[in-house]
Amino acid sequence: MNGIALLIGLGPLLGWGLFPTIASKIGGKPVNQIIGTTFGTFIFALVYNLVQGIALPSGAALIWSIISGIGWASAQILTFHSFTLVGSSRAMPITTAFQLLGTSLWGVFALGDWPSTSDKLVGFLALALIILGAWMTTWSEHKTDENSAKLRKAVIILLVGEIGYWAYSAAPQAAKIDGSKAFLPQAIGMCLVAICYAVYLKVKEPSQRSALAQGVSYKQIISGFFFAFAALTYLISAQPNMNGLATGFILSQTSVVLATLTGIWFLHEKKTKKEMVVTLIGLAIIIGAATMTVIV
């Protein structure tokens, strides 16, 4: 691995690692966060396509790519809602674990990954470790009924959101479209969800000011740039002449460590010393298990 490939591979670490913390720090409701995030992603993707001279795909490739973006934005709204319940430092390891589980199971049952019995044994052991690691990051030394109820609600929300994240990764595969060409139409799908969600909330509560007219929604464009930067650098990192799919994937998953720690440090999502130790061990288990899923 050369230096340039490593730097590009660390792009998702910075982008996806800082994205949830920045979105939470800027503030606003989930609708404000999804508007800014998707608009920022669209701007980033549009500039990238113009600079690279990439034409918008057509036909099934366009439709599947837009569906991919719709899936991501729908899931991300639910993830933002989970932040309001348990904070990003607890929500991010859970959603990362669910995405790893979803991606791995899709690969096994739909794409024929882990063909041998030994591969399956190692792979499913890794999935069990991912679940263990995610549970450890949510462990609380001083439990209360209220906090336990919030955590259960957040887990259910994130589990439902996994359907959208699965569509985000699986839909482009259905069209067999290159990731860089799917980038802009994915952003279009994301923006459609954000606008529809904002309009729905305005119709539901006419007396409330539309999120599309609130300044905080457009401040969130900054967080969208971080997400888009991570998504683009991951596409580049996963190319065979860079880090390759397996190494690129492992490097990208390290973002959960940064997302969790910055949530604790900068958003003051406090943990006791014991909780911090257990959280760090849980994060290490998730990263180690993610590595296992791509080497079998």
Swiss-Prot record:
TM regions (residue ranges): 2-24, 34-51, 58-80, 90-112, 121-139, 182-201, 221-240, 245-267, 276-295
Keyword list, A-Z: Cell membrane, Membrane, Sugar transport, Transmembrane, Transmembrane helix, Transport
Subcellular location: Cell membrane
InterPro entries xrefs: Sugar_transport
Gene Ontology molecular function, alphabetical: carbohydrate transmembrane transporter activity
Classification via CDD domains: ribose_uptake_RbsU
Keyword match Membrane: yes
Gene Ontology cellular-component annotations: plasma membrane
Membrane topology qualifier: Multi-pass membrane protein
Family under the similarity heading: Belongs to the GRP transporter (TC 2.A.7.5) family.
PANTHER family: TRANSMEMBRANE PROTEIN 144
Function, as annotated: Could be involved in the uptake of ribose.
Protein name: Putative ribose uptake protein RbsU
Phylogenetic lineage: Bacteria, Bacillati, Bacillota, Bacilli, Lactobacillales
